[in-house]
Amino acid sequence: LEKLEKYQKAGEVGNLLKEFDAISVRDANSGSIVEQFTGEEPVYNLDPVLTYDYMNCCDRIPQIEATEKYLILYAYAGRISNEEADWIAEYAKKKNLKVYAIGGIQKCADRFVDCSPFEVLAYFRNAEEVITDTFHGSIFSVITHRPFTTLIRKSVGNSYGNEEKLSDLLNRLVLTE
């Protein structure tokens, strides 16, 4: 909302949102923004990945043979800081795990895995652990029953923040410390 106001787009976005007959959202922050713009409370829906039992009912997830123990780093390129990358590399070394990067090339990764959405789930299923800073990385960890850490960041200036969406997800799933 703050950035829309900064760029003088809040009125335009608000008017466009009011033209919809219905709006649904996945998190409280998005819901608050929609309500501020439209005066209407949106419908809250689960992410589609949580509405289907992919791991037990989908025959498109391949069996991937793991030749080594690994943790998945699921993050877009450029979002893992050097300090975080160093910490992840040291953590993996202590646990005797390789770091497989999915979603983007990472400084600390032993291997970048370029794969289909169904293969992503196969890699998650076989991982020892997951470190992510994404909404879907957290969800994939939950549906594959993998231990995971979600890196949460505040929006500062023009930098990407995931705090609102991820904090809401983890609170709704009762997965906060």
Q: Model-derived features: where do they sit?
A:
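Active-site anion-handling motifs in enzyme catalytic cores
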Residues: 1-177
